[in-house]
Structures are given as structure tokens and as C-alpha cells.
């Protein structure tokens, strides 16, 4: 409870415990347009829980001047494996840490460190019982640090078939195996950025230098970042972004708006549990 106002604080908004009314709209209401702006868990608190209206955990350490963004990625599906879980988590962690990002809170500059853990869940077996068990776990999950990613031969859940996808600001994704095959690929870090709430930037980044990690395929970029540096800037002859040449930049870190989060006991959250 907030001692000054007498209201309950839930990280994203306040609730009056006397009237049971929320003060302020749900910050993720744009993702659920059919729900009241002031509702809690779709007005269904029996089966749903929303601990803070927001998903990776962000922890501030004032002593070491670091901000740690942590998440656990649970991989399952026809192409998932323990090796994929380990490799993909490492690619995401390394990709985001490559920026050596910083955030300023007040008058203090903090180094941003990403700590990503990968877990594999085998959902094969008789009668699909393991898959059903995982689906139940996903439905009941309220921990915004835990993300569930299905690894498939061909992705179908996104806006474009055949492309890996992740809920914007959410904690569920679908990775197409050939998009993430091999170490050092950038699709994983790109999709994780969506999970943190980031969207695609302008599709024309010519004369803007290094493309950030959120630049999508078919983006127009400076020649050295194209599939074919000698091609004209179009999608016919390799004249668009080679995804292998995008990377996390300080601008991507800035776009997370960590400095705008409301920290309680040194912790806050990016995104939300879906």
C-alpha cells in the first residue's frame, strides 16, 4: 500500500481498496481492445492474474552501477532441443550485450547487462500429455520473466508465414528453425526485442549508418549492409538489409525506455505476461 495515498500500487497503476476501482488505464490496453480500459484481468480474476500489468525483469544495482535485464526462455516444439535452447539464449544475451548499453537514472549512468537463460521442454510422447501439461503451465503463468517459444520447421502464427515472430511486449514466440540455425544469428535477438515491447523502425534507413537489431528484412540500408553491396536499393537483386549485419545499438537500448519504468525495491518489468 502507498502510505501517502492509501491506495494499492501494482507497478503500473493504483487501485482504491475501498471502492475496488483502478486509478488509470491498463498500460497494455492497446493489445486487448475488447477489454475495458479500467478492467482487471478481463474482469475474470478467478482464472487470470495480472500482478503488475507489465514482462523480462529489470533490476537496478546502485552499488555496481548496473541494470540487469533477465529472462528465462522455455523452448518446445518439433525442432526444439536442449542445444537449441542453450545456443539461442546465448545468441540473445550476446547480441544485446554487444551494445555495451547504458541508461541514465537521475544523475547516475548505469551499464545495462542482459542475462538470458534457456530451458528445453520435451513435449513429445504418448497422447500429447506433455504438450497439454505445458499449455496448462503457460495458461497459468504469471511470471513476466518466463517466455515460451515454439521452434518449428515453418512459422505460421505471425503476420507473414515463414517468418519467426514474437508477441509485441509479450512472452510468447514462434521461431522458424532455419531462421535461428547456427550460432551468431540475429533473428533471436530481433524477436526478443519484440518481446520487450520494441517495434520495427522506418523501412528506409539509408544514410543512417548501422541498422539496429529491430530493422526487419527488406529494409533499405546503406550498401555495405545489403546482401549485395553493389546492388541498387531494392528487393530484387540483394539491395536490402542482410539480417546478419544488423545489431543491437545504443538506440535500441534507449527505445526500451528503462529510465521511464517505475522501480520498486530496485525492480521493474518490461513487456507483460501473455
Label for each model-derived stretch:
Residues 62-85:
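Fold-level signature of zinc-dependent metallopeptidase catalytic domains
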Residues 29, 45-46, 200-202, 220:
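Acidic glycine-/aspartate-rich tracts in secreted/extracellular proteins
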Residues 2-7, 11-57:
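Short turn/helix-capping motifs enriched in Asx and small/polar residues
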Residues 72-76, 152-154, 198, 216-219:
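Active-site-proximal beta-strand/loop segments in catalytic clefts of secreted hydrolases
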Residues 83-204:
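Metzincin-family zinc-dependent endopeptidase catalytic domain
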Residues 168-183, 202-274:
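Metalloprotease/metallohydrolase-associated module, dominated by Zn2+-dependent proteases
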Residues 10-11, 36, 69, 198, ...:
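Residues that flank catalytic or metal-binding motifs in active/ligand-binding sites
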Residues 54-63, 274:
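Extended, hydrophobic alpha-helical membrane-active domains that insert into or remodel lipid bilayers
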Amino acid at each position: 500500500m502507498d502510505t501517502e495515498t492509501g491506495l494499492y500500487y501494482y507497478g503500473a497503476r493504483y487501485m482504491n481498496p475501498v471502492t475496488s476501482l483502478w486509478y488509470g488505464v491498463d498500460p497494455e490496453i492497446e493489445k486487448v481492445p475488447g477489454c475495458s480500459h479500467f478492467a482487471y484481468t478481463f474482469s475474470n480474476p478467478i482464472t487470470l492474474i495480472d500482478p503488475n500489468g507489465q514482462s523480462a525483469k529489470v533490476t537496478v544495482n546502485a552499488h555496481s552501477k548496473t541494470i540487469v535485464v533477465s529472462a528465462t526462455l522455455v523452448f518446445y516444439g518439433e525442432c526444439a532441443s536442449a542445444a537449441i535452447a542453450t545456443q539461442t539464449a546465448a545468441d540473445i544475451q550476446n547480441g544485446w550485450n554487444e551494445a555495451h548499453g547504458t541508461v541514465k537514472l537521475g544523475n547516475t549512468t548505469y551499464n545495462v547487462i542482459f542475462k538470458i537463460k534457456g530451458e528445453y521442454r520435451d513435449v513429445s510422447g504418448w497422447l500429447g500429455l506433455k504438450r497439454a501439461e505445458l499449455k496448462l503451465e503457460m495458461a497459468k503463468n504469471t511470471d513476466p520473466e518466463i517466455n515460451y517459444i515454439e521452434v518449428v520447421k515453418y512459422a505460421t502464427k505471425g503476420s507473414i508465414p515463414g517468418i519467426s515472430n514474437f508477441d509485441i511486449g509479450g512472452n510468447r514466440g514462434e521461431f522458424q528453425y532455419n531462421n535461428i540455425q547456427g550460432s551468431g544469428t540475429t533473428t533471436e535477438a530481433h524477436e526478443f526485442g519484440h518481446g520487450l515491447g520494441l517495434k520495427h523502425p522506418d523501412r528506409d534507413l539509408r544514410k543512417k549508418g548501422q541498422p539496429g537489431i529491430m530493422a526487419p528484412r527488406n529494409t533499405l540500408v546503406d550498401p555495405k549492409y545489403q546482401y549485395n553491396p553493389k546492388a541498387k536499393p531494392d528487393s530484387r537483386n540483394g539491395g536490402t538489409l542482410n539480417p546478419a549485419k544488423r545489431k543491437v545499438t545504443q538506440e535500441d537500448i534507449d527505445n526500451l525506455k528503462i529510465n521511464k519504468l517505475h522501480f520498486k525495491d530496485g525492480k521493474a518489468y518490461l513487456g507483460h505476461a501473455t
